[in-house]
Amino acid sequence: MIQVLLVTVCLAVFPYQGSSIILESGNVNDYEVVYPRKVTALPKRAVQQKYEDAMQYEFKVNGEPVVLHLEKNKGLFSEDYSETHYSPDGREITTYPSVEDHCYYHGRIHNDADSTASISACDGLKGYFKLQGETYLIEPLKLPDSEAHAVYKYENIEKEDEAPKMCGVTQNWESDESIKKASQLYLTPEQQRFPQRYVKLAIVVDYGMYTKYNRDSDKITVRVHEMVNHITEMYRPLNIDITLSLLDVWSEKDLITVQSDSDVTLEVFGDWRESVLLKRRSHDCAHLLTDTKLNDNTIGVAYKKGMCDPKLSVGLVQDYSKNVFMVAVTMTHEIGHNLGMEHDEDKNGKKCKCDTCIMSPVISDKQSKLFSDCSKNDYQTFLTNYKPQCILNAPLRTDTVSTPVSGNELLEEGEDCYCHIPPNPCCDPATCKLTPGSQCAEGLCCDQCRFKKKGTICRFARGDYPDDRCTGLSDDCPRWNDL
């Protein structure tokens, strides 16, 4: 039996709202100041790590209490993750840092089935969470001897300039090799559930970005780790594991000519990846982060359908914002092109316009960080038609299976249900198993430990989409197009 120790670290919420503030992530209008209260669940006599495997935080948003459940993102790094920089004479200096006890988490809000969270706990809480359909960001205020944090909505980040931020290259790439085409255009419910896929990602940082952060390798590393943690969370609904395989920082000079012509830079970077980077370390996709201002208000470019190709499985992303979440959304978008996704636009008879979705051609003030149904269909079609082989196999990870920890609010190996604090009457807190006679413990289609009847509305209609309804066989509330 696993016993749980509750540790209360800090108490209270400071009920203060401000109109404007300058944060590490940029200028923000309309924010809340909170003091999160931390409650940690640990097995008795557990070996203490610097960063726990699972944590809970309580604070208020808009006057309402929320409970944020976090679990360490153990798939963030590959087991052989490496970092490379360069000596003044051009020699590669590669290290293999220990990253198992890292400080990057994913999670959700208690009692909000559609919530998500991606948080760095390295120095306070920094990241984002989705609550009741709204995306909020949180970060420490960096006040002396204070645990104060700012919470604010995505749309309240002040623009650093007024020019629209756009994706540049979305050119189709067709292989010269024979490609097996799908015999059916209709995607079956089984296809819609998305098979598990794995992308080993390489991030390259150019010299301009390195100097932008005062040649501080630690600052660059933290920024990239935060970015990839966000990206991995955004790809979870598609059943894609993004694992950071390597970080290559051009610390002495650029190893290619990085210019504002994004098409040219992307092509040259693809050549360098094929001839140099792939020979050094195996990976599936490489993206170059640059401080160079790209032409035509472009902030990112990538080859569509290029995933797994030695030259074309690449992208180029401008580090255009102090806010790492905004740059992470852009890289998520460009990886989407590598995976066959088109822009969310109305064209060729397809009604796909979605200004707030990840694959919108122009970044929105109200970014939702969701993939549209059109993007999901594009991705599934890419898998069916192109059958990319490199993303089939799971990479070695720093920690693939954790010891079950009761009370961490995320389902782990051997558990049937989430062990709540306080306990859920449908779930045995000692074993994380359903109590006798219970079919479920929670979920939009669970009521008093039993599945709701087939046809019960579990999510009301939004826009052009109809109501989502329970199946009577599960506690999940399936999207209408998964039925």
UniProtKB/Swiss-Prot annotation:
Residues 21-190, 396-411 form a propeptide. PROSITE patterns: ADAM_MEPRO, DISINTEGRIN_1, DISINTEGRIN_2, ZINC_PROTEASE. A motif (Cell attachment site) lies at residues 462-464. Residues 1-20 form the signal peptide. Pfam families: Disintegrin (PF00200), Pep_M12B_propep (PF01562), Reprolysin (PF01421). GO terms for molecular function: metal ion binding; metalloendopeptidase activity; toxin activity. The active site is at residue 334. GO terms for cellular component: extracellular region; plasma membrane. Its main location: secreted. InterPro entries: Disintegrin_CS (IPR018358), Disintegrin_dom (IPR001762), Disintegrin_dom_sf (IPR036436), MetalloPept_cat_dom_sf (IPR024079), Peptidase_M12B (IPR001590), Peptidase_M12B_N (IPR002870), Reprolysin_adamalysin (IPR034027). Belongs to the venom metalloproteinase (M12B) family. P-II subfamily. P-IIa sub-subfamily. The disintegrin belongs to the medium disintegrin subfamily. This is Zinc metalloproteinase/disintegrin. It comes from Protobothrops jerdonii (Jerdon's pitviper).
